[in-house]
Regions:
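ATP-binding Walker
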Residues: 17
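Conserved substrate/cofactor phosphate-moiety recognition/catalytic segment
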Residues: 28-65
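Walker A/P-loop
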Residues: 20
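NTP-dependent small-molecule kinase module
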Residues: 140-214
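P-loop (Walker A) phosphate-binding loop of NTP-binding proteins
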Residues: 14
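A glycine- and Lys/Arg-enriched "phosphate-lid" helix/loop adjacent to the NTP-binding pocket
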Residues: 92-165
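Glycine-rich phosphate-binding loop used to anchor ATP phosphates in small-molecule kinases
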Residues: 54, 58-124
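Hydrophobic anchor at the beta1->P-loop junction of P-loop NTPases
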Residues: 11
C-alpha cells in the first residue's frame, strides 16, 4: 500500500485535452513518477475504423492495462504519482458512451462493468482528480496538431458525446475531490499563472495528507 503522505493524482480529460503534457510537466516539477495511458493498444486503429466490431476488445485492453497500473501504484515507493487518465474514465466515459451509441452490446457492457466494479471496490480513488475540460473545437485543434494517424478521422459527434459523458461524470457520479481546468481559457503551457494555480492546489493537498497522517 502507498504511504499516506504520498500524493496520487489522476489527470482526466478528453482526447487532445493535454493530459499527457500536464502529466509530464507536473512529474518533472514534483520529482514524481508518471503512469501514462497506453497509446499502443493493438486494437485502437481497428477501433477507429470499425467501432462496433472492436469496442469491447479495445476497452478490455485498456482496463487490463489500468489494473496493472493500479497495482504498480499501490506497490510504489515514497514518490508522488501522476496518472494520465484513470480507470473511472474507461468505464464511465468511454465504455458507457459506446454502449449508449449502440457500439457495444448490452451483454459486453454488463460484463465490462462487472469486472470494473470488482476492481474499483478494492482500490482507493486518487487523492485529487484534475479534470481538463475542453470544448470540441479545442480538442480537434490539439488532435490535428499532434498528428496521430489513427486519430485523423475521429468523428466530431463522437467527441461531443464524450464531453457530455465527462460533464455528467464530474457533476453527478464521481465522489472524489476535483480541480477543473477550463482548457478553452486556461492554458497551463503558455500561462504560468495557470500552472501555479494547479500547483497551489497540489501543495494544499500534500499538507492535508501530511496532517492526516500525524
Amino acid at each position: 500500500m502507498k504511504d499516506g503522505s504520498i500524493m496520487v493524482i489522476g489527470i482526466a480529460g478528453g482526447t487532445g485535452s493535454g493530459k499527457t503534457t500536464l502529466t509530464e510537466m507536473l512529474t518533472e516539477r514534483y520529482g514524481a513518477k508518471a503512469y501514462y495511458e497506453q497509446s499502443d493498444n493493438p486494437y485502437i486503429g481497428d477501433f477507429y475504423n470499425d467501432m462496433n466490431r472492436w469496442s469491447f476488445n479495445l476497452q478490455m485492453y485498456f482496463l487490463g492495462s489500468r489494473i496493472q497500473q493500479t497495482m504498480d501504484i499501490l506497490r510504489s515507493g515514497p514518490v508522488d504519482i501522476f496518472q494520465d487518465r484513470t480507470v473511472y474514465e474507461d468505464a464511465y466515459i468511454f465504455a458507457d458512451n459506446l454502449h449508449r451509441m449502440g457500439l457495444m452490446s448490452g451483454r459486453d457492457f454488463d460484463t465490462y462493468m462487472s469486472i470494473f466494479g470488482l476492481i474499483t471496490n478494492l482500490v482507493p480513488r486518487p487523492d485529487l482528480l484534475i479534470y481538463l475540460k475542453a470544448s470540441v473545437p479545442t480538442l480537434i485543434s490539439q488532435i490535428r496538431r499532434r498528428g496521430r494517424a489513427y486519430e485523423m478521422n475521429i468523428d466530431e459527434q463522437y467527441l461531443r458525446r464524450l464531453n457530455d459523458r465527462y460533464d455528467d461524470w464530474i457533476e453527478n457520479i464521481y465522489r472524489g475531490e476535483v480541480l477543473v481546468i477550463d482548457k478553452d481559457r486556461e492554458d497551463f503551457v503558455a500561462d504560468a499563472a495557470v500552472m501555479e494555480k494547479i500547483c497551489a492546489r497540489l501543495d494544499r493537498k500534500r499538507e492535508e495528507l501530511e496532517t492526516a497522517k500525524k
